[in-house]
Amino acid sequence: MPTPLTVVAAIIENEHGQLLIAERPPNKAWAGYWEFPGGKIEPGESHEAALLRELREELGLNLAGETLTHYYHGNRGAEVILDFYHIRLTRDIAPQSLEGQRWRWVSRAEITDYRFPEPNAAVLQKLQNASA
């Protein structure tokens, strides 16, 4: 059985309680859907190091020094493991679209207005329950 692919994503929350989401680019699976920024773990990389690297590569964010709190762990069959980390910002940040994707800050209530890939359903439900 092949080793599952591990994907890490950041639920980045600003000082106004808004969450950062990014639109998946046209050349990727789930194109046009929205997601929490992140990506694949490289061999020998920790979850946290991979997430910080992906945030730098995709959005030009240097979040070293911010606290990453594990928020959710899920499996998509046997092929993919999803790990989400919550980052509550202690300073203003300005994401950039380094890979051409759109991004925006949304409230927890607004998040249901966006289409997310099906594997994100459980973490979205957890976010909705936390805001109720």
Q: Could you say what each language-model-derived stretch is?
A:
Residues 18-57:
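Conserved Nudix-box catalytic region and its N-terminal flanking loop in Nudix hydrolases
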Residues 18-19, 103, 116:
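A residue-level structural signature of the nucleotidyltransferase/glycosyltransferase Rossmann-like core
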Residues 62-71:
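A short coil-to-beta-strand element that immediately follows conserved catalytic motifs
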